[in-house]
């Protein structure tokens, strides 16, 4: 029994030393916070799992899959309106000073208005830094997608003649809710405020006034083909 006890102690000490040794010779590529077990994307970039502390390698270590670099131009295909994804794209560009131009191809049914606002705000910031942002619509840009497509650099917003764009009144959804008259009035007030903000911005980048936009979307959707997008000032020319 005594020998068995001594043997158990020796084995425990040996195992302890082995574990400690593994920790000491742990490869530097393994995140010291997660050990690549849980939440590894907190410290590592996808899909290569290089530590985020390492600057992304030009031309292949992209933060998102729907972007690419061609010469001095960064291309991005916006299919879902996600501000975080666009921010990763812009942050990547700022790491690469040789990029002079940004092309955003919008092919999206829209999404969150607030994500759309943030994306437009980031676009304005990048343009203020000297970047030209060209927007392209080959197929479909609706709702917040339309807001983004119309917000590129003036003279650099292009559409296909067969493309379709759409703008509409804002909508809110509440399931299984019981509203009082004052609740409904407050919701209407907030929606009106948000609608006016969006329409005011579109009026500033297009040829329609706020009142004209309000009239065109009142209880219906405002659809524009490529020719109409250029005619109403939300695009500057046609893709060739």
What residue ranges belong to the model's regions?
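Bacterial N-terminal signal peptides
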Residues: 8-16
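Sec-dependent signal peptide recognition
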Residues: 2-8, 140
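Terminal-region recognition feature
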Residues: 20-240
């Amino acid at each position: 029994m005594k020998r068995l006890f001594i043997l158990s102690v020796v084995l425990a000490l040996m195992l302890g030393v082995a574990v400690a040794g593994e920790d000491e010779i742990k490869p530097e590529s393994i995140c010291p916070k997660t050990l690549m077990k849980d939440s590894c994307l907190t410290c590592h970039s996808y899909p290569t799992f290089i530590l985020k502390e390492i600057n992304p390698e030009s031309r292949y270590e992209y933060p998102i899959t729907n972007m690419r670099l061609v010469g001095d131009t960064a291309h991005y295909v916006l299919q879902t309106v996600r501000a975080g994804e666009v921010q990763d794209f812009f942050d990547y560009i700022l790491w690469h000073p040789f990029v002079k131009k940004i092309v955003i191809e919008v092919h999206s049914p829209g999404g969150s208005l607030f994500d759309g606002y943030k994306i437009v705000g980031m676009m304005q910031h990048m343009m203020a830094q000297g970047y030209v942002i060209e927007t392209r619509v080959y197929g479909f840009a609706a709702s917040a997608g339309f807001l983004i497509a119309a917000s590129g650099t003036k003279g650099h917003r292009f559409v296909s003649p067969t493309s379709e764009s759409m703008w509409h009144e804002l909508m809110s959804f509440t399931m299984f809710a019981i509203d009082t008259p004052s609740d409904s009035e407050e919701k209407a007030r907030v929606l009106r405020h948000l609608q006016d903000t969006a329409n005011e911005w579109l009026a500033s980048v297009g040829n329609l006034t706020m009142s004209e936009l309000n009239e065109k979307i009142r209880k219906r959707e405002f659809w524009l083909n490529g020719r109409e997008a250029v005619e109403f000032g939300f695009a500057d020319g046609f893709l060739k």
